[in-house]
């Protein structure tokens, strides 16, 4: 079976929750799954004063870790319609892996969180996907086989480009059952694809 890395950055825990759901879906296929986060770049005093969720259980990843997986699913909150600076700084350091073609042919996917419905979810997913395509990866999104993203009964995240959640302006809304199911579904599809390609 394949090895899957769920790599994320989360400020208040919303993306962390999606990451765990992505991992659950991937594990359901029999894949070996690790969840890791990128290093925090905000000074500890600022993070504490801003009420960042600093007690996240996932270990911190290194750029070299990326070479050890068949699939890499990347999640980050939106920062003004793009990926967070923490994730950007981490991916920018992967130039050596890119130069050697280490990530070519691996399976990739993206997920995100925004404060509002129209706060840049798809733009952020595209910016993650652009990185993964430059690395030579094959992208798996969240197709409409996840029926939840089509509901009109409640506000939900989700896009064909990846799982998403809407956190609210103060971070007061946690990922809904439908959004977590979308993340699980995407994780399952990514792992199934990697299992077919890498056994």
Swiss-Prot record:
Regarding protein family, the annotation reads: Belongs to the WrbA family.
Q: Domain (Flavodoxin-like): give its ranges.
A: 4-190
Q: Name one GO cellular component term.
A: membrane
The molecule here is called: NAD(P)H dehydrogenase (quinone)
Enzyme Commission number(s) from the entry:
1.6.5.2
Q: Which InterPro entries match?
A: Flavodoxin/NO_synth (IPR008254), Flavoprotein-like_sf (IPR029039), Flavoprotein_WrbA-like (IPR010089), FMN_Rdtase-like_dom (IPR005025), NQO (IPR037513)
Q: Which Pfam families match?
A: FMN_red (PF03358)
Among PANTHER family, the record links this protein to: FLAVODOXIN-RELATED PROTEIN WRBA-RELATED, FLAVOPROTEIN-LIKE PROTEIN YCP4-RELATED
Please state what class of enzyme this protein is. Answer: oxidoreductase
């Amino acid at each position: 079976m394949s090895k899957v890395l769920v790599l994320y950055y989360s400020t208040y825990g919303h993306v962390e929750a999606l990451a765990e759901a992505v991992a659950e879906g991937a594990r359901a296929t029999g894949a070996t799954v690790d969840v890791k986060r990128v290093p925090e770049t905000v000074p500890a005093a600022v993070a504490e004063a801003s009420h960042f969720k600093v007690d996240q259980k996932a270990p911190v990843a290194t750029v070299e870790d990326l070479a050890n997986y068949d699939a890499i699913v990347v999640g980050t909150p939106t920062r003004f319609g793009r990926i967070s600076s923490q994730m950007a700084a981490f991916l920018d350091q992967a130039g050596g892996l890119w130069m050697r073609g280490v990530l070519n042919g691996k399976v990739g996917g993206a997920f995100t969180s925004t404060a509002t419905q129209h706060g840049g979810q798809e733009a952020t997913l595209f910016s993650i996907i652009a990185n993964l395509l430059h690395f030579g990866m094959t992208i798996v999104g969240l197709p409409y086989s996840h029926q939840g993203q089509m509901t009109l009964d409640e506000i939900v995240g989700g896009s064909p480009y990846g799982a998403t959640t809407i956190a609210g302006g103060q971070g007061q809304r946690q990922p809904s059952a439908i959004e977590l199911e979308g993340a699980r579904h995407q994780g399952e599809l990514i792992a199934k694809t990697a299992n077919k390609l890498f056994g």
